[in-house]
Amino acid sequence: MSDFEDNNPFAGADRRDSVSSDATDDGPSASFLATNTTNDFGGASFMAGGGSFYGAASQIGGLGGMGMSAYDPESALANPFDDGSNSFSATPTASITNQNDTAHEATNERTTTASQSNIPPIEIIEANKNHEGTSRGFITYTIRVGDVSVRRRYSEFESLRTTLTRMFPTLIVPPIPEKHSITDYAVAPTKAREDKDMIEHRQRMLQVFLNRCRNLPQISNCIVFQRFLDPHASWSEVLNSPPVSTLPRYSLRAPPVDPSNNVTEAHSYLPIPSANGVVRNRGGDEEGKQEAFFAEAEKTAKEYEAVIGGGLEKVARRILKRYTDIAGDYAELGGRFNALSLEESDSRMAATVEKVGQAIDSNYLATNHLVRELGRQFGEPLAESAQFSGVVRSVLKYRKQKALQLELTSDSLEAKRVTLASLESAEADSQRINDALGRTRSNNGPSTTNSGEQPSASPAPKKSSGFKIPGLSSLNSAFNNMMDADPEASRRQGIGKTREQIGQLEQALEVAQKDIVVANESVEKDLERFRAEREADLKCMIRAFLKCHIDWAKQNLDTWQSAQAEVESM
């Protein structure tokens, strides 16, 4: 038995590539939100891609005053991205520090009806550049919860989400808006950091993220989330204090629920399975059906992400770009008609041409606003939906690795038991041989010569020094070290170590069996919640998409009918 096998309880079993997950930390004193300071843990994992419409949605500036009513916020499925009381009343695009309040109100209305959280609806009221401790500066987002405000950076939102995924590995933690691409930083790093459209997009989506977290009892009751909203809490201290600082380095070597408090010594014996491993098909038993259910859920999430992120989103983005181009053409055409009206000597004809030019200008403004509202009410939630699919796949991946962990532990335990049986059998055979030799010697007795005199002692033979190659002393030493001088002692030592490893694996198997039951129940429950939420969000997106186009078409129809009446009255 090699040194590796001596020290590794999983040696001799199926060895698969290992995958690890890293840690972060969490924090200090009581929060102003500490209405419930109990740590409630439950689950989630990493995030995935998905594009954004914020660029196309705001490539054109603000508008003048069109009177299109937006999607009704009184609906039970009120869209968290819908601007609630927002109308197609063309106000200029809000500055970084003065966002359109109606978007925040709509989000709050949705989250208030969807949750019984003790935390009031959350708003991000502004985004400002801050120069504290640096000459270059950074953007901070002002979060308002009731009468209390706190400023946080994007990187702090990012670390919050990472921490939540480690604390709740079986929970579908909402995604946050994407980072800048490497290309953006390479081309114009300063512009990438301070891009107004990106900041406004992040402001809206970070508010959606916080309110979605607020709707999840596990997160809203979590002290880490409450301290994130506490203006008196230092976030760096939160990340370096319990419960975050007590989270294990590898989430797979911890229980699925409350991993910062419920870790046992047995968890340290668990293997880290490959992320690409396949759970064995157990046929028609209950466990087999459950594995089939999760495999189908993973397949569906992957297909949904491909349909949304790789298909629908790209096409919708192209359409928004075309609307943007058309709006620009309408603006130019309206100006040409107005110039033409000034050239007309007939005042009646000049007024008619000017009326047509005004209709075209109105069409430009309406199309401009359509692009912006489609980006906010349809594009942004669509991109978030693609990100959610990636989050679901990450949670399912964690659950699958927990199932693989159980299989690996069971296989390793069985292999070690076979090894122990083999060693014990060899030890028993060796003992029988030694006993037989002992009996043979005792039966023969000491031999004597006929004269009764002891024979003269012959010189003792030289003790063999083992394997030798003349002139190669170092090589001789290496070979001699490899040769087992006392195989019986080595075998007994191997038996002792194998028994110890079997004891560790039996403990590991027990916690692995408990963990997979908890993980399966928790993931399945959260998948049901997420599916209902996704269905409601999809209805909101479709309704918003239809409403934006209907209001845009009605506004244009009224404008062109007014122009037609002017022309026909000539």
Curated annotation (Swiss-Prot):
InterPro entries: AH/BAR_dom_sf, PX_dom, PX_dom_sf, PX_Snx41/Atg20, Sorting_Nexin_Autophagy. Residues 1-31, 81-115, 429-498 are annotated as: Disordered. One of its GO terms (molecular function) is phosphatidylinositol-3-phosphate binding. It is found in: Endosome membrane; Endomembrane system. This is Sorting nexin-41. It comes from the Eukaryota. Residues 84-101, 440-454 have a biased composition (Polar residues). One of its GO terms (biological process) is protein transport. CDD domains: BAR_Atg20p, PX_SNX41_42. The PX domain binds phosphatidylinositol 3-phosphate which is necessary for peripheral membrane localization to the perivacuolar punctate structures. Residues 455-464 have a biased composition (Low complexity). Belongs to the sorting nexin family. Keywords: Autophagy, Endosome, Lipid-binding, Membrane, Protein transport, Transport. May be required for cytoplasm to vacuole transport (Cvt) and pexophagy. A 1,2-diacyl-sn-glycero-3-phospho-(1D-myo-inositol-3-phosphate) binds at R153, S155, K179, R202.
